Amino acid sequence: MGQGVGLLFLLMKKLFTILFAALSATTSLHAQTTTPAWQKFVNNADDNVLLDFSYAGYHHGTEQPVDERDVYVLAKKLGYTVYNVCDHGAIPNDGISDRAAFEKIIEKICGRNKTTGKLNAKPEAKAIIYFPEGEYILHSKDDNTTNAETRKVTSNTLNLVMGYVIIKGAGRDKTFIKMEDPMQPTNPNIMYSSPKMISIRHNGGGDNNILAKVTGSAKKGDMSIEVDYASKINVGDWVKLFLLSKDKNAIKEELYPYDVQASMSNINGSGEKEGVNVVDRHQIKAIEGNRVIFEEPIMHAVNPAYGWDIRTYAHYEEVGVEDLTFKGKAKDNFHHHAGWEDDGAYKPLDFMRQVNSWVRRVDFVSISECMTFSECANCFLLDSEISGNRGHSSVRMQYSARGFIGKVWDHSNGYLNDDKNFTEYKENLGQYHACGISKQSIGNVIWQCHWGDDSCFESHATQPRASLFDQCCGGFMQFRMGGDINQLPNHLDDLTMWNFNCLATNPNDPVPFNWWVKNTWNGWYKTLPPTLVGFHGKNVSFKEDEMKLNENQGKEVLPGSLYEAQLTRRLGSTPQWLIDAKNITTGIESVKTIENTNNTDNKTYDLNGMPVGKNYKGVVVKKGKKMLNGVI
């Protein structure tokens, strides 16, 4: 068989496998036609408990960035310059570090300050850093520096202080960026202190300056706020709606219906950065007098008496990483908090203060912490596989607003944390913390992610709020959400889980599941009453009096995806990017189909039970039968 014919055969075989898996996906025959929680949201009922999460994602969920697999076609469309690492000294597959070539490109893009000699920031780099097919090493022990006096070894981050830049490979099955050796910790006693290998960032100059004092109140879902003077605010600006308050009433309201506990110094301490801290990043849509109108709904009620204000948000935009795989060497015998090599030695990438930026079609193999979006807004990660040796964490939105994490398949392997002697190697445990959120995050969506059997969604304390876990599946381990005792609660108001499919539990976990463990100094899980709709799979007994809503437990509900339903309702139709995303086959075995068995009309429905138009391409349900519509 010729090479071309063989390749065609493999592609057709893969396509057939994908289509067969999708068409034979399990259909839930007992699904509700429409769950009451959705009806109350649509009708804006007095007892509605759902926030509008549809503004999460790139350009508020309306579209995706320009997508071309051919780097030169992409560059032409965008008006960018391509910097091929091989043209600057990188040699793939030679086992030698290619860091110097990458540094040459950064310097060529940014230039240096003639006075200080430091690299310049580049807000609009308009550059694509391209890694052709092959394996490239961007960190090895040879890249470390050693202090001549103390002999301390330091690993240094590759900082890209720029916007409008894309790091692109030839495909995640073709381009591999490798961490050959661990990133050394700044302090071995601080287990998370190893730096990232690559950080694409704004360094924060001009951030957090007060622009106006908030004078009016607002409810969750409102789109505007009254301020004292709006003269420093402009249409199109990105700003922070900000609160830091030690007011005892504010703390009491924030923790209601629970009381503050002595261990909670983050929310109840006297330090400069302690107290109730809300950071809701917004783009300015319009200004009418001293009323500031946002593009997005406010996700936290505003009481001006507590000292709310509008602040600057320093950031860059349009940063992307796509079509490659990061490879590390996470320990074969990972144990949580066993040491710095376990918790953070291999952290390939983070974004810091980026807006409308993305990671797509990027895989992670044997990584400690896969990807962190920190102080970002409306960024996304879509279509990612996590495999190899398990590590500390997956993908998180940290101190970020309206991010979107979708279609992550996390099935890394290793040992249970209770297996102190490493006697039984297990597959599909997943990262210790699965996809999720951390710190003062708000409005983020984790969508159709599938994580391992010994994991749970991450909710890493320090005041995250208003998070949606939508159509996700995987383990549901108690006490796995993360966060130090002084940073609790793990999650404040408006934790929402929609159609979660529980695939594994720990038989040794307490029953019933506690959302607010009463023990003050050893209560490692505390979240305000959550909203669960359509929680199904393995049975979990919940304490109902610790929940805001537990609707239709044991059943999948319609709409299948809350994010999709809200976005479709807002825009009038489902955007093409989300239609395409639903057909992504990473982790295809986890696909669930919900059939609206009451529909006897001739309408065509997608796999979430939502009506779609005649131009929809993919697997659909019509008159109770699954079929292909159009061509994938």
Feature-to-residue mapping (PLM):
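Right-handed parallel beta-helix
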Residues: 86, 164, 173, 237, 245-277, 281, 285-286, 317-328, ...
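Catalytic domains of carbohydrate-active enzymes that cleave complex glycans
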Residues: 449, 454, 465, 470-585
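Residue-level detector of functionally pivotal "anchor" positions at catalytic/ligand-binding pockets or at interdomain
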Residues: 584-608
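C-terminal tail/sorting-segment detector
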Residues: 619-632
